């Protein structure tokens, strides 16, 4: 803790060196968590490049914690730390996507690149289902909304960032369009 408080950069370098020498789930978790905290600090201070880098480090190390073959024997899905890493992965991914997307809008069919000192990720916003990417204007983050009047709340836990697809107004005036709400999602 003292090393982190006095020089976070040296602390990260030390932890990363130890992780590279011997992948350890606790060290990977610590690196992911500290990187996420530093990303939040950098974003708040307007250092968006640094924030993106820290979120990327948190994202990649969280991913390694969850899926690396090196940790297969020690990983325990029932350990509360495992759930915390799942949350850290999701939060890092969402914050990374927010920084990559203008006005917090992810465009269908667009590819986003995330580069960290460790690796590069390519994230593609893909459509699944019968509607094509040209039928949507943008995606929005579900976490930007709060349900206030529905009594039933259905939550599915897992990895990823839930999005809302906002439909474009069609160019041709189909008679059925009058029955659709504006910005139908």
Show the residue positions of the predicted features.
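Flexible, membrane-associating and regulatory peripheral segments of lipid-active enzymes
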Residues: 1-27, 31-185
